[in-house]
């Protein structure tokens, strides 16, 4: 039991107030509360404060502070509910207070996992090279419910996925190494899978893509063969050819082109 003996504005924040409570046989209690809490409980000098009322005041102020922290966190970008929960927990806010804050944020439309997920998909679709499966995994890490994620991915149409995957294919083609068409297509396939595109989308893109010309395949084989031949040059001719065929075939070149290269080597030699 105690009595409020002083109420003053804090120097740091004009919306927070120092409350000094005189308690019998105990040292005075000094705490700060938000102006909304001050008004809610109609706090004033001379007011009697029992332990139950004090707990209610402290709890209400904890909600107000956590709410302000959540708003500041939301000021940078939209957030999922789970992001807000994790942020407030790191700030030391207890779960009952967090739930109170979330209820208020939902009511005021500051948080909405459906709107958040839909906006997230649109943003990633328009600003990144991610496929839907990668975006889905990111939304799962952000704590968005599976049913909400499924609905949000409608924002990323199948045709848009094909266009995005084809763009990655064309970029990879421009940066193509000296490799066989088979090795190139496998490398691009793995890249598109890591980016989160489905097998169906990848199959369409690779089928539509124009692979190596025959001359490009010969040039790539020549580059790889020149690297490998030094490794086997000391072998007798039959073993040398066997080793070269095996090594170049593993790199995706056809036996016909490999044998053609070996014949040219014989002619040059």
Curated annotation (Swiss-Prot):
Pfam assignment, any one: RecX_HTH1
Record bears the keyword Disulfide bond: no
Gene3D superfamilies on file: Winged helix-like DNA-binding domain superfamily/Winged helix DNA-binding domain
GO biological process, one term: regulation of DNA repair
Cellular localisation: Cytoplasm
Source species, domain of life: Bacteria
One Gene Ontology term, aspect cellular component: cytoplasm
Record InterPro entries: RecX_HTH_1st, RecX_HTH_2nd, RecX_HTH_3rd, Regulatory_RecX, WH-like_DNA-bd_sf
UniProt KW keywords: Cytoplasm
UniProt keyword Iron-sulfur present: no
Major subcellular site: cytoplasm
Role this protein plays: Modulates RecA activity.
NCBIfam families given in the database record: PRK14135.1 (NF010733)
PANTHER family from the UniProt entry: REGULATORY PROTEIN RECX FAMILY PROTEIN (PTHR33602:SF1)
HAMAP family the record matches: RecX
Family membership noted in the UniProt record: Belongs to the RecX family.
Protein name (database record): Regulatory protein RecX
Gene: recX
